[in-house]
Amino acid sequence: MSERKYFGTDGVRAVAGEFPLTSAWVMSLGAAAGEVLRRVNPHARVVIGKDTRQSGDMLEAALAAGLTSRGVTVIHVGVLPTPGVSYLTRHLKADAGVVISASHNPYEDNGIKFFGADGQKLSDATELQIEAAIDEVPGFAPLTGTAMGSVTNYTEAEHLYTDFLKSHAPDLSGLKIALDCANGAAYRVAPKVFQAAGADVFAIYTTPDGRNINRGCGSTHMDHLRQIVREGEYDLGVAFDGDADRALFVDSRGQVVHGDHMLLLNARARGEQAVVATIMTNMALEAKLQDAGIPLERTAVGDRYVHERLHEKGLSLGGEQSGHVLFLDISPTGDGVLTALLTLASMKKLGTTLDALHDDLVMYPQTLVNVRVQDKKAIAVDQQVQQAVRQAEEQLLGRGRVNLRPSGTENLIRVMVEGQDAAEIHEVARVLAGVVEARGQA
């Protein structure tokens, strides 16, 4: 595959206003994407949605200008969760969808992510075509008059997406639920859906001002939600991130119920043939699934890898501890509000509670040591390191596991050891990290 210049695993991300997320570059991106799309369909239509960041307006306008300059019709759906844009792209039979969001990042950051007509992440091949076309934008033949595209505001977007979510909501009557909407894209949708399902809802962080998204709130800052649930005697709490593609729970005691817990509960309730998770997923989940006769498949860290494995194996359920859970039989992308609703449906089906789930799945101790090295690629093939890993695995056989992986951004090797005995795994990690450090400086 060709080397990417702009697109990462989750689209284009940067500080808004700095390259590449300047108005000029984003307009070129829109023109390039429009040109690629109109080669397939001269009357292409693109859905654009965003989260609540202040920079979203500027990026949305620049992107729409570029797209319409190449004859594309732009459909604005306004502030909507990322999965809502995926849903509207499919529902409106558009040629593509675009989300302007940086998920759980601070408000200064933003990003641009494309969906295909199927509501899934745009294919690598199409992204590479768009990247190549960006450099060609100055040479595009200008379109004038009726050849230019137009912009429409689709005012029914939130209503349609909310109806979709309601169709998958269980009866939540009698449940007292606190919601943390992160001052993000779910600030209107989530409370509406949970109230419509019959829950007694108390929603916090529902007053976005363009700068307070994810600030001390949401699924990466859950202390306030935990306090509210404990002190207010709520049955549970749910926290979303800025673009609401993931969700985490809090049980009635204020304890966090994360993705591993959700995978176990949903796998049991839905009778899944297998579950896909990552190398960071706790062994305790694997053991519990094994008890239920459900195998666990592991992938590299990242929801895209979970998604790929689910497709390869024809499976439905997968996810990460972060609360990014996929139900591919219902939605082609992670959806925090949907995940929360389906998890509560599974809870009701099994007649259990999040408190009981938290107590049932006791996580194995896990230790992570970051070791700075000169060449992280060399460590991956170093024979002495490989021998040390084999020895560690033999020592932990049946009681734990070892994983070494390079940092994606720094010259670090992350040494992760997990097992039933905390003292043992700390000693194994110490010895293994020592070998990595010695070889990393050799």
Swiss-Prot record:
<dbReference type="Pfam" id="PF00408">
    <property type="entry name" value="PGM_PMM_IV"/>
</dbReference>
<dbReference type="InterPro" id="IPR005843">
    <property type="entry name" value="A-D-PHexomutase_C"/>
</dbReference>
<feature type="active site" description="Phosphoserine intermediate">
    <location>
        <position position="103"/>
    </location>
</feature>
<dbReference type="Pfam" id="PF02879">
    <property type="entry name" value="PGM_PMM_II"/>
</dbReference>
<dbReference type="InterPro" id="IPR016066">
    <property type="entry name" value="A-D-PHexomutase_CS"/>
</dbReference>
<dbReference type="GO" id="GO:0005829">
    <property type="term" value="C:cytosol"/>
</dbReference>
<feature type="binding site">
    <location>
        <position position="243"/>
    </location>
    <ligand>
        <name>Mg(2+)</name>
    </ligand>
</feature>
<dbReference type="Pfam" id="PF02878">
    <property type="entry name" value="PGM_PMM_I"/>
</dbReference>
<feature type="binding site">
    <location>
        <position position="241"/>
    </location>
    <ligand>
        <name>Mg(2+)</name>
    </ligand>
</feature>
<dbReference type="GO" id="GO:0006048">
    <property type="term" value="P:UDP-N-acetylglucosamine biosynthetic process"/>
</dbReference>
<dbReference type="InterPro" id="IPR016055">
    <property type="entry name" value="A-D-PHexomutase_a/b/a-I/II/III"/>
</dbReference>
<keyword id="KW-0479">Metal-binding</keyword>
<feature type="binding site" description="via phosphate group">
    <location>
        <position position="103"/>
    </location>
    <ligand>
        <name>Mg(2+)</name>
    </ligand>
</feature>
<keyword id="KW-0460">Magnesium</keyword>
<dbReference type="InterPro" id="IPR005844">
    <property type="entry name" value="A-D-PHexomutase_a/b/a-I"/>
</dbReference>
<feature type="modified residue" description="Phosphoserine">
    <location>
        <position position="103"/>
    </location>
</feature>
<dbReference type="InterPro" id="IPR050060">
    <property type="entry name" value="Phosphoglucosamine_mutase"/>
</dbReference>
<dbReference type="GO" id="GO:0005975">
    <property type="term" value="P:carbohydrate metabolic process"/>
</dbReference>
<dbReference type="InterPro" id="IPR036900">
    <property type="entry name" value="A-D-PHexomutase_C_sf"/>
</dbReference>
<dbReference type="InterPro" id="IPR005845">
    <property type="entry name" value="A-D-PHexomutase_a/b/a-II"/>
</dbReference>
<dbReference type="GO" id="GO:0008966">
    <property type="term" value="F:phosphoglucosamine mutase activity"/>
</dbReference>
<dbReference type="GO" id="GO:0000287">
    <property type="term" value="F:magnesium ion binding"/>
</dbReference>
<dbReference type="GO" id="GO:0004615">
    <property type="term" value="F:phosphomannomutase activity"/>
</dbReference>
<keyword id="KW-0597">Phosphoprotein</keyword>
<dbReference type="GO" id="GO:0009252">
    <property type="term" value="P:peptidoglycan biosynthetic process"/>
</dbReference>
<keyword id="KW-0413">Isomerase</keyword>
<protein>
    <recommendedName>
        <fullName>Phosphoglucosamine mutase</fullName>
        <ecNumber>5.4.2.10</ecNumber>
    </recommendedName>
</protein>
<dbReference type="Pfam" id="PF02880">
    <property type="entry name" value="PGM_PMM_III"/>
</dbReference>
<comment type="function">
    <text>Catalyzes the conversion of glucosamine-6-phosphate to glucosamine-1-phosphate.</text>
</comment>
<feature type="binding site">
    <location>
        <position position="245"/>
    </location>
    <ligand>
        <name>Mg(2+)</name>
    </ligand>
</feature>
<dbReference type="InterPro" id="IPR006352">
    <property type="entry name" value="GlmM_bact"/>
</dbReference>
<dbReference type="InterPro" id="IPR005846">
    <property type="entry name" value="A-D-PHexomutase_a/b/a-III"/>
</dbReference>
<dbReference type="InterPro" id="IPR005841">
    <property type="entry name" value="Alpha-D-phosphohexomutase_SF"/>
</dbReference>
<comment type="similarity">
    <text>Belongs to the phosphohexose mutase family.</text>
</comment>
